């Protein structure tokens, strides 16, 4: 069963065959918060640098929902960061540009799609940049950077998301 936290490899039988599911682990060890939707990306020119993010929820005390940001500079041996970097509605989508700038898109505290960036490996973050045209019903974002150095759009960051209200109701919207 893939719903429970486990440190064991699990095997899932599907019509396509049997697949091994690696064990769960916390990117940033903590006992007071959950971590879900945890994408991890690697720096395009330094494979020892990785940037991860997660939805976090305080399971004791206050009911704070947040986006967490974690980084490693030693290939994943150790991680640092915060479970409460940006207070919002989650759905983190991390990116690292070829310049080393970290970016993360997420659902803002108003329900719109937005992003923040860091120029110091995630130690400090910009304020929220809200995407033009995003309504209070934005969801399901995915972000990426054009990493092809010969591309006309090299270094451009893209986010696609679903808009559930406004002029783009039930459409997938792209922004860069």
Predicted regions and their residues:
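C-terminal PAP-associated
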Residues: 1-176
